[in-house]
Structures are given as C-alpha cells and as structure tokens.
Amino acid sequence: CSSDLEYNKDKLSAFLAGSISNTGYWRYDRFYYDKQHAESETVNFIGYTVKGGANYNLNEYHNVFANVGYISRAPFFSGGAFLQSATSNATNPDAVNEKIFSFELGYGFRSPYFTANLNVYHTQWFDKTNAASVNIEDEKGNQVDRATINMQGVDATHQGIELDFVARPFRWLDINGMFSIGNWRWSSTPKGYFYNSLGQPLAYENGKFVEATGIMAPDHASVALDLDGVRVGGSAQTTASLGATAKISKALRVGFDCVFYGRNYSDWAIESSDLTYNINKTLVYDSPWRIPSAYVCDLNASYRFKIGGVNAILSGVVNNLFDRSE
C-alpha cells in the first residue's frame, strides 16, 4: 500500500510519500526432493519506502529544490532468500533487506531562451545481494558439488554533481547538453559463509570442504572481502553530451549528438581461486581496470508529411557516425 501528501502555496511546493510491501519467496522442487518435502518454507520480507522533497521559486527565473528518500527492499530470490535456488530449498538464515538512502540539493534556471538544472547527490547502498561459488572436488579432481558463499554487508557510496541545459538562441535551433561527474566506491568489508548445494554449512579442513557443526559455528568456513574504497564498475563516472536540433523547415528536422564516457571501470568479480586461497581469511580486492575513455556521435533526421490526409513521419538515425571503435 502507499500514500502521499502534497503542499503547494505561493512560491513553495512540497511532497511526502511512502509505501509498504511484503515479498514472500518459496520454491517447489520435485527434481531433488520427494513429494513430501518438495515445497520449501515461505520467507517473507517487509519492505518500505519513504521519500519527500520541496521546491522554492525564488522568482520567475530561479528555483532551488531538495529531495530525500529511503528504500528498504527484499533481497533477490537467488543468492539472497535462498542459498542455492536452483537445487535446494534451504533458505538463507542471514538474508536481510537491501537498503538505499539518498538525498539531493539543486538549483534551476528558467527563461524563454535558456533552461538549466544543477544538482549534487549522495546515495548510500547497504546490504546489496551478492553471491559466488567454488567447486567441491573429490580426490581425483572431479567436481562433486558447489560451495556457495553469500556475502553480507556489501555497501557502496555514490555521490556526484550533475548539470543539464537546453538553449534556444533562435526559433529554429535547440542546443542541449549535460555533464555529470561522480565518485562511486564500495565502502565495506563484507563477510560470507560457505554452504553446499543442499544448504548445509561447510567447514574447511586439510584443504577439503567437510560438513560444519552448524550455521555460523566456529568451524563454519568463511571469506571476508575488503572492498573499502574500490571503484564501482560497470558505469561511466564521468559523462558529458552535447547536441543540437535544427528545424530546417516546418516539416524537416536534423539533429546531431555526441556523448563522452570517462572513468568507466570494469566490475569486480570473485574468482573461484580467490575463494579457495582465502578461506577463513580476508581477500583484499584492488581497484579494477579503468576502461579507456570514449565518445560516440549520432546523426538523426525526421520529415513530416501527409499520406491520404493522414499525418506521417519518416525518420532515420545514423549511430556512431564517425565509426569510433575504442
């Protein structure tokens, strides 16, 4: 369920909204279980969101705004609620909701010829779902099972500055652009425990996985991962774009856009060998590879016309106009 409140008077507008939900997970498995034990227990996670914001118009051209929000959402089904969702009904005793806290402060400018927004943001992620696994082998080196580890307490901090604008120097020309620079880093040393494909806790003795005395018992095998300060990968942390659209005639429009991507890092991954060599230790993860910066430019055009009295649009796009391949 959800609800929201809004306030709007004179130069000030504000809102407050919230919601609450229940996510229930269960699985039914007749491949690894008999009929009596095919259905797992149901695990429930209560999630909620709270967010609010305000905008104040200083005058007809300038405004300032602020927004804040908090989200608590259920962990993923696989590697979160269940230890081995493909083969086991065993639930993860350490599964917790993922949490996100975020706020932003901003300034806006509006005029007939120029519009711009500038904002700073700070977002914190807590308890992100993350899992990895390693082979369990017999004396001959043959794989007999998989040991899965569910990392707990994977946190990250995203913060940065964003600017976007639209300029209309002439009636027939629109110029738009944006710039964003961020500082996104992992910010914790999560720890995870090993379980086999049936969800049983594992110990590590004499170079082999064996059954542990209990979940999170002193002999329950684990790995801690030192991610503090490691760059978040998979998305450029510096981006910029510049484009223009020209209205050649009432029917014809031509546009050109260029986008720059910088400070993009490869995403970190836990290899099986990393887990094997660091059981009951702390694995220190170095900053990942920084992908070379790149840019790409696109050309687009559209033409409006009528066919039998019906409005029609013919449009086309040339992606990567300069055939960049970095």
Give each language-model segment a name.
Residues 24-31, 58-103, 115, 120-152, ...:
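Surface-exposed extracellular loop regions of Gram-negative outer-membrane beta-barrel proteins
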Residues 1-62, 79, 84-85, 191:
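Signature of Gram-negative outer-membrane beta-barrel scaffolds
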Residues 9-12, 57-61, 100, 110-114, ...:
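Outer-membrane beta-barrel channels and translocator barrels
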Residues 122-124, 149-270:
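Gram-negative outer-membrane beta-barrel transporters
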